[in-house]
């Protein structure tokens, strides 16, 4: 993959702050008594470091070297094992909990997605829990992402002008193209990501094929039931 510009990485936590998704995961970790946790697609580690506590092993895996460099520099960064890679690089062991937040699941294309589920299933102990979310394709969130006009904000590197474009690549597949112009230097950074929107039925089928049992499907981080109009598909599944 083409890695992220470090100047954009430095803005990630402001754009994706700690919120109800992270609170949900922390509650779940306590609920299941997790002593070992794997955060797949951990990014800057904003959630990962909050899961680490005395006697608990926490591992963060991400394919972005720039994201991991930021994560390692966190004051609490030495409390986590950081691994550059994807699900194939999950270390041996029987984890109690695996998490994927910030719609990480949508960044993994087929068939790598099915392999990812199999890899996570293998890494969990019997009864170990997997939780992740994906945007509900029925809501068509991508239609709200196109910027009618560029916006500008101040950063540590000066004024940053931003706008977004999308391309529909097929059923449930969207390319998000983010333009970032650092006005002081004129440097134009373009970051492109392909997102896969999977519906509830497809997600459950893929989990079953990987050996998981689906315990719950929520439509929001407050634990409310999933409906066809829910913004998210939040899945809690277990090995065995």
What do these predicted regions represent?
Residues 46-89:
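Class I SAM-dependent methyltransferase SAM/SAH-binding core
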Residues 41-43:
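Class I SAM-dependent methyltransferase "Motif I" SAM/SAH-binding loop
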Residues 90-97:
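A short acidic, Gly/Pro-enriched loop at the edge of an enzyme's catalytic core
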Residues 127-134:
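Conserved beta-strand signature within the Rossmann-like core of class I S-adenosyl-L-methionine
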Residues 1-35:
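Conserved class I S-adenosyl-L-methionine
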Residues 114-126:
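A short glycine-rich, Lys/Arg-flanked "PGG" loop and its adjoining helix->strand segment in the class I
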Residues 134-204:
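SAM-dependent methyltransferase
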């Amino acid at each position: 993959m083409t890695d992220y510009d470090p100047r954009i990485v430095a803005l990630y936590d402001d754009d994706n702050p700690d919120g109800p998704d992270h609170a949900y995961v922390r509650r779940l970790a306590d609920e299941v008594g997790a002593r070992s946790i794997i955060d797949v697609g951990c990014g800057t580690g904003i959630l990962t470091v909050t899961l680490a506590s005395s006697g608990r092993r926490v591992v963060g895996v991400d394919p972005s070297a720039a994201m991991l460099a930021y994560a390692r520099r966190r004051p609490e960064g030495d409390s986590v094992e950081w691994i550059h890679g994807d699900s194939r690089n999950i270390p041996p062991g029987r984890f109690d909990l695996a998490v994927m937040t910030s719609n990480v699941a949508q960044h993994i294309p087929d068939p790598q997605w099915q392999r990812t589920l199999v890899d996570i299933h293998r890494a969990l102990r019997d009864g170990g829990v997997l939780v992740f979310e994906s945007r509900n394709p029925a809501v068509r969130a991508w239609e709200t992402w196109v910027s009618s006009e560029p916006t500008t904000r101040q950063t540590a590197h000066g004024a940053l002008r931003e706008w977004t474009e999308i391309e529909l690549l097929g059923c449930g597949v969207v390319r998000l193209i983010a333009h970032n112009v650092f006005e002081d230097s004129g440097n134009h950074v373009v970051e492109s990501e392909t997102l896969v929107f999977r519906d509830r039925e497809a997600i459950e089928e893929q989990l079953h094929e990987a050996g998981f049992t689906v315990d719950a499907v929520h439509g929001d981080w407050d634990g409310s039931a999933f409906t066809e109009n829910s913004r998210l598909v939040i899945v809690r599944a277990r090995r065995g």
